[in-house]
Amino acid sequence: MYITIHLKKGIPAIFGMALVVVCLSGKALGAITISIDYSLDSTGFFSDGDGAAKKAALEAARDVFEGIISDSIAAITPGGANTWNATGYHPGTGASGTLATDLSVAADTLIIYAGGRALSGSNLAQGGPGGWSGSGTVGFVDNLYNRGESGITNGSAVELGTQTDFAPWGGTITFDNDDVAWHYDHTTSVDAGKFDFYTAALHELVHAIGFGTSNSWDDLVSSGTFTGSQSNTSNGGSNVSLYSADGGTTYGHWVSGTTSVRLSDGASQETAMDPDVTAGTRKYLTNLDAMGLADIGWQLNITAVPEPSTWALMSGIALLGFGAVRRYRLNPLTCKSSQ
């Protein structure tokens, strides 16, 4: 499944009531660990001269989710007859297939393989959750499906009924490495005409953990709107209109121009998960973005959201930005593979 995101100038309007959250570092109690794995970065995107800044920006985006997700998910522990393959899109080649065999995944941990490659057309980045194939005891295979989450029902190698949770082993994220004017330093203002790497990383990570890419998301989509109760409340009591890049077959983003309030300071901002981003600007996670994650099953503890250290410097930048319109396509592989 492909999801296209358009990057263009947006003018966010004041929306809803501000939710002010104290900006502290550290993880939420019982937090999920998101382990960024660069071992499949076959093009060396994260090991060139800008590699340290790229990693710092990606890991700062990762820290946001480690700071608010308080879920608990079971470990994946292969051994003996219990064997499995983690599948997905290789971040360095784009090939779809096995990424790792008999990968051990610790409890409360997601693994995100990150890399870079030349993406076709005007694509900036791609990301999404991984799939799997496996065999073994009933308990082992069930755990590949649900990692102990009761809201994911399955049987005979197919998922059954309405899904209210999501718990993948992890996923992949890839950034264009040949013709994008990236701004890598997440601690400084975004240069005019450049695309903010932190913003792209934040957006892709949300997709990697199920936003627009999971069965529990799909089960809440109706007539071009998202019907999740917490998103509805965050959106002033209305279902959230969605954007489709393929004429209504799939919906993976809030509709263009959707606004909410930043978790970091309660200021109004265009959501991180609408399809529009402007060169020269930075986006932060908003309340509506977070409620989308809550509705697909993630337990959240929104008391502390770490953002780049200079978010205050950037607070007036989100409405600015100059440069050509740019589109990028996400390439998530949903966790629906059978044994």
Predicted regions and their residues:
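Bacterial N-terminal signal peptides that target proteins for export
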Residues: Y2-F15, S309
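A short, hydrophobic C-terminal helix/tail in secreted or cell-surface proteins
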Residues: E307-V325
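Extracellular zinc-dependent metalloprotease catalytic-domain scaffold
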Residues: L29-L202, H207-A304
